Amino acid sequence: MLHPMSRVLVVLGLLAALVLAGGATMAIQRPGPPDRSVRPAEQRSPRQTVNGPPQTVNGPNYPRVRFRASRAIGVPHAGRLARGTRLPSRGPGFDTWDPITRQSPSRGWRRNGTDDLVRMVAAVARRYRAARPGALPMLVGDLSRPRGGDFGPQYGFIGHATHQNGLDVDVYYPRRDGRRGVPKTPAQVDRRLSQRLVDLFVDAGAQTVLVGPNVALRGPPGVVQPFPNHDNHLHVRIANPG
């Protein structure tokens, strides 16, 4: 049988142990300072979250492309773009051109598309450069707005009937004189290099390539089609993967 004083000491010891255990539990549960290096989940793109960091177009000297598991909704003339992927202002074998400011690079809000479209543009540009190392870069015009939708005259004096859901891109024909910029007349178009671009986009799986009726470019019927107001650029559309 314990002496009364011993009982007091035992009780005090148990109480001290409980206090220490409770403090340890509180220390474990108390949140530490936020980790500023981690972006909130809603700010990460699906591609970054699921499949690692953003991918480069081709090597470290070019801007990174943040593929975002984008989705084309609706149809090109009445649709929108979910999680649009932005084409860099420049990359291996291509530059961008703003048809409103008439200078390079194009403003970012004019060059958004689906992941597949951005990949196609980058791939065709690399192949174009490989085939013609001395040629000027492929000159890319409008894709879509960041969330797609109407791309009419209110966004500049050039209106697009399509370009609404990230499946369309304009590419300007190379010039015969080898100068940078957009050809002003069909006579200024380098037809040989332009035909090369058409062939590359067809080989890459383009669903439709619209070309100028006065530029005399050819391709598979039903894919390459002459269309008014396309004498200074070709218009490429890819299929909606669903």
Which positions does each model-derived feature cover?
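Catalytic cores and adjacent binding grooves of peptidoglycan-active enzymes
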Residues: 25-27, 179-242
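Solvent-exposed coil/turn segments that connect beta secondary-structure elements
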Residues: 143-145, 174-176, 239-241
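N-terminal secretory targeting signals
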Residues: 2-84
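Active-site acidic/histidine clusters and adjacent loop/turn architecture
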Residues: 71-141, 196, 200
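Substrate-binding cleft of extracellular glycoside hydrolase catalytic domains
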Residues: 69-85, 158-176
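Extracytoplasmic
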Residues: 133-135, 164-168, 231
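Mid-length scaffold segments of soluble, non-membrane domains
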Residues: 151, 160-189, 193
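Extended, low-complexity, intrinsically disordered C-terminal regulatory tails
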Residues: 57, 62-69, 73, 118-159, ...
